[in-house]
Structure formats: C-alpha cells, structure tokens
Amino acid sequence: VPTLVTDQGIVHYETYGRGRPVILLHGWLGSWALWRNTIEELGKDYKTYALDFFGFGDSVRSQQVSVDLYIDLVYQFMEKLGIVKAPLIGHSMGGTVALGVAARYPSKVVKTIIIGSPIVGSSLNPILKLSGYQRIANLVYTFPFLKDSAIYVLTRFGGREGAATYRMVAEDAGKVAPQPFFQSIGTLRNTNLVEKLPLLQIPILGIYGKRDIIVDPRQGKLLLQYAPSAQQAWFEGSGHFPMMDERERFHGVVREFLEKRS
C-alpha cells in the first residue's frame, strides 16, 4: 500500500497508469475508492494519483484537520513525489481544496475540474452544516443509526445509482473518527471562494448534477460568474456523484477537458 510521510501525518494514496500526472481528490466522508473507475479509465493515458485526506480512508493524523490543512497536504504530496505541476480533479470538498491549491500555489496547478463543489459553504445541505458542530458529531457517533440514516437519505435520493453510492459512502464513512468528521465539514461550511476565483487564471471546469441534494448545483453559476476562465458541464441525470450516475459521459467530459490545450 503506497504511503507518504509528510510534516502533518501519513498519507495513503493509490496510483495507476502511465503518462502525465493527474491528481484526484475525494470529498467529505470519502476516500480514494470514489475514483476506482476513473483512475482505470484515465490511467490508459495518464499517471493517476488518488490520495486519502487526513482522517479519511487510510491516511493518519491525530491533530486537527481542515480544508486549509488539506490544501497544504496536496502541495506537500506533489513536492514529495516530484510532481512539478498537474491538473487537479476534486469532488465536493476535494474540489474546494483543488481551487484552494490553485490560489495558494498557482505554479503547481495546470487546470482544475471540480465536481459538485461548494463555492460558498452556505450551499451545503443543512444536514452537512449541522455535522460541523462537535455536539452534533458526538450525538451521531453515540447513536450510529443517525449517521447511517443521514447517509442513506443523502445518497439514495437524487442520483440514478443511489444504491451503489450509498454502499460506497457508508463503507468509507465507517472509517472516519468523530474529530475529522466534524472539523473538516465545519471548515467547509465556512468556506467562501468568491474573492479567490477572479485571481485564478487557469482553465476550470465545474461539473454539477441537476439532482444534487448535498451541494446546491447553482454553485456552478457562481463559478462562471467569478472565475474568468471557467466553464460548466451540466449533468441532468446526476445527483452529487456524476461519476457514479452518468459514468461514461462523466469520463468523456473529464478526458476532453484534460486533453484540451490550455
């Protein structure tokens, strides 16, 4: 199992394929497993890296976690592996992190694809907003059926592949301890990228599912409004997980954007 020791902790990641590097970043309660099909598809032409953020999947850290920490984690990950620059693909919280990396370390990012990502934290489903409070998180972990019920509602409804998505998210969420559970979503809830977006000169693609009930899909309009070089792909039949709901089209859109000359 590939791991990397950074200043902040131990990072688990998976890599597949050959060619130019592409880095994939999962969302809240997720892990690299979200990208299992994507790294197989992109790995035909690219060297793909899918990492677990601290506190998720198999990455280890005992201290506080935050979106800000994850931005620095991606930078350190690239530095340690000798990746000079690369496109970043991020789902949900991972997309917010990807935009943060592009703003803080512009020389490292060629282009970004964000999928169902919040530009402002107020776009999160109320269940996610509440999860950012320690008291609520403690309650959820005291009564596990609360977490299971919330995951069921958020994943089963909205997308076409709700059953498969629920199984994947429930398995990943089972590995997450209370601290990263509420700390990461708490900092995501307070996110506001409106001031940073106009500074980004790289190509940005926002993929949003029309049936998303986890992050308001109208965030795509904010992206287009504030990012000078952004474009949007609208997935009519998808919820929060277009890579599950409309897999073939998703991979086609991602590949086309990656291959387009900047």
Which positions does each model-derived feature cover?
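Catalytic active-site module of serine/aspartate enzymes centered on a nucleophile-bearing elbow/loop
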Residues: A230-S262
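Short beta-strand/loop motif that positions the catalytic acidic residue
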Residues: L200, G206-Y208, D212
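Conserved alpha/beta-hydrolase catalytic His-Asp/Glu region
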Residues: S123-K129, T142-L199
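Flexible "cap/lid" loop of the alpha/beta hydrolase fold
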Residues: G100-R104, V110-Y141
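Gly/Ala-rich beta-loop-alpha elbow adjacent to hydrolase catalytic centers
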Residues: G90, G94, A98
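Active-site loop/oxyanion-hole signature of alpha/beta-hydrolase fold enzymes
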Residues: Y49-I89, G252
